[in-house]
């Protein structure tokens, strides 16, 4: 059965040039070498000193990303891309002002569950794919009023392997994934499981794709630079968004 959804609800906004999808690393503290443990603790201490000096009130700590080496962290980021050119013919999305004084919105429990589970991009810098696919999944759940697809999980490997105008594990822009979903559809993860590699052939998927495709309509952009009001309105009107964000080193310890 072919599944279809209009992607009017997956508007995205683009901000700065580095994007990150936090990963759930299986590397526990006990698996690190004593040298790596010492280095990590020194990094966290230095981050905390900087946080305190600026008068901020959050505490740096051990996270899955802090357990990575600096080289491993860098490999998961979009770090060498050319600046994004916003003038690429993507229509702006006008959003109704519905934010009011609302300070909390959880699309996991807002008349249904419209958010899929946390994923792990591993050592591949494929955050640009994971963020966009998560928005596509939420758009599909919106189209069917949420929660009616058990364990919805679309394939990140499919666009990672098949999109030619990206840099694979070296990064890319999420609108390329949205374009691909609109023009070619999406497959589920069982049909083409994620392998943390951009060398997997595009055709290395299940044979019965005609029965497990997801097709989408158009998408739009909310803003290219951060605009809090527009983003809040878009979250209320359209649901979860694809975004990029600029990060600093201490973000890894948050």
Residue ranges and their predicted role:
Residues 2-12:
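Bacterial N-terminal signal peptides that target proteins for export
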């Amino acid at each position: 059965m072919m599944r279809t959804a209009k992607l009017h609800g997956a508007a995205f906004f683009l901000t700065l040039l580095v994007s990150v999808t936090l990963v759930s690393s299986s590397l526990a503290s006990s698996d690190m070498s004593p040298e790596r443990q010492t280095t990590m603790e020194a990094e966290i201490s230095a981050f905390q000193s900087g946080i305190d000096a600026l008068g901020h009130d959050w505490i740096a700590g051990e996270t899955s990303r802090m357990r990575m080496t600096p080289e491993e962290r860098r490999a998961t980021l979009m770090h060498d891309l050319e600046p994004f050119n916003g003038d690429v013919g993507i229509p702006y999305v006008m959003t109704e002002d519905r934010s009011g004084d609302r300070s909390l919105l959880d699309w996991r429990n807002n008349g249904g569950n419209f958010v899929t589970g946390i994923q792990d991009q591993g050592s591949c810098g494929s955050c640009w794919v994971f963020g966009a696919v998560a928005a596509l999944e939420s758009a599909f759940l919106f189209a069917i009023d949420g929660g009616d697809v058990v364990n919805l999980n679309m394939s990140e490997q499919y666009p990672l392997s098949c999109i030619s105008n990206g840099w694979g594990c070296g990064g890319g822009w999420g609108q390329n994934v949205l374009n691909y979903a609109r023009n070619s559809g999406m497959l589920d993860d069982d049909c083409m499981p994620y392998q943390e590699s951009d060398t997997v052939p595009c055709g290395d998927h299940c044979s019965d794709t005609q029965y497990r495709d997801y097709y989408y309509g158009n998408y739009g952009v909310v803003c290219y630079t951060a605009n809090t009001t527009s983003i809040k309105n878009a979250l209320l009107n359209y649901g979860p968004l694809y975004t990029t964000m600029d990060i600093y080193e201490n973000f890894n310890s948050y």
